[in-house]
A protein has these predicted regions:
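Intrinsically disordered, low-complexity terminal tails and inter-domain linkers enriched
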Residues: 268-297
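Helix-loop-helix hairpins and the membrane-proximal interhelical loops
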Residues: 44, 52-77, 81-85
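Membrane-embedded alpha-helical hairpins and interfacial helices in multi-pass inner-membrane proteins
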Residues: 2-53, 95-97, 101, 136, ...
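Interfacial aromatic-anchored transmembrane helix boundaries in multi-pass membrane proteins
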Residues: 88-103, 123-158
Length: 301
């Protein structure tokens, strides 16, 4: 029987767990469309702890499987912790218009280190930021998941932008950060919007069709969130334009240094004195190391 915890099987399991985190997150955002608000006035107070626990278990299991399969080094996990903590600290930085430095850090980390790193960095950074700012509540798991999607999508984009000239890569990432400024706000609003008390054109009720639901939410978003998110989107773009090139270069230098070093050696051969024959040069044919190959972790999904 094949070992279910072999490196190949474990790496595959880790990727499946990343997909599972995304599926659980989507289900968590859509759940209130089928569940009514509770009597306490906190519509997500009941299911939020369950979603938090489930996502936490999936993240920890995925990281454990990565370490078990040796697809991630202990140093890369430590780097993930440091980047997540630094990004969480940036949440304390209040920018004009309500922007925050946490999102540009998550986006650049994902672009530099890859999809898996961006996903987990986004999740952990929002948790750290919430602990520092006192922002722990039923909204936290939804903020963390949305931030994780920012980092993961930046990792996918990073595989394409690294082929561009550095200047244009930064411009592309700045535009991407600008779009996510609106996307993040539109996604996170769903943690409470379906269970708002009201029957007006800005609210949702079970009798609405899908098209009517989209129309009502669009009106709600334009009325309550668009201006705030526009400021955040602008902050993302400006920060990336100003610091993106230097931060990406620093991240990628670290990624190269932390990448596993694999050296291949040629099989040892019998020396000339043991075989009774000599080589043309009179030297023994000792094993010599082949050219080392560097496995760059940033290319891993």
């Amino acid at each position: 029987m094949a070992d279910l915890l072999s490196p190949t099987a474990t790496n595959r399991r880790s990727r499946l767990l990343m997909v599972a985190i995304t599926i659980v997150g989507i289900a968590g955002f859509l759940l209130p469309f089928w569940l009514p608000a509770d009597a306490s006035g906190q519509p997500r107070s009941a299911e939020a702890p369950m979603l938090t626990a489930l996502v936490a278990v999936l993240v920890l299991v995925a990281l454990a499987l990565d370490l078990r399969s040796h697809t991630r080094s202990a140093a890369s996990i430590a780097l993930l912790g440091m980047v997540s903590a630094a990004a969480g600290l940036l949440r304390l930085l209040d920018l004009p218009g309500g922007g925050s430095g946490v999102f540009f850090a998550i986006l650049l980390a994902g672009a530099a280190f890859g999809t898996w790193f961006g996903l987990y960095a986004g999740i952990f950074a929002m948790v750290v930021g919430a602990l520092l700012t006192g922002g722990v509540g039923p909204w936290l798991p939804y903020q963390a998941l949305a931030a994780g999607w920012i980092g993961a999508s930046a990792g996918l984009l990073g595989h394409l932008t690294r082929r561009l000239a550095p200047r244009w890569e930064v411009v592309a990432l700045a535009g991407f950060g600008w779009l996510w400024g609106f996307g993040y706000g539109a996604i996170v609003n769903l943690w409470f919007w379906p269970v708002r008390v009201g029957t007006g054109e800005l609210d949702w009720n079970p009798g609405l069709s899908v098209a009517e639901t989209v129309q009502h939410y669009w009106r709600f978003y334009l009325t309550t969130s668009f201006a705030w998110d526009a400021a955040g989107a602008l902050a993302n773009a400006v920060l990336i334009l100003l610091t993106g090139r230097a931060v990406l270069e620093a991240f990628r230098r670290v990624a190269h240094r932390l990448a596993p070093q694999i050296e291949f050696y040629t099989p040892a051969t019998t020396s000339a004195s043991e075989t009774g024959s000599s080589s043309p040069s009179g030297a023994s044919a000792d094993a010599r190391p082949a050219t080392p190959h560097v496995a760059d972790e940033r290319t891993a999904p």
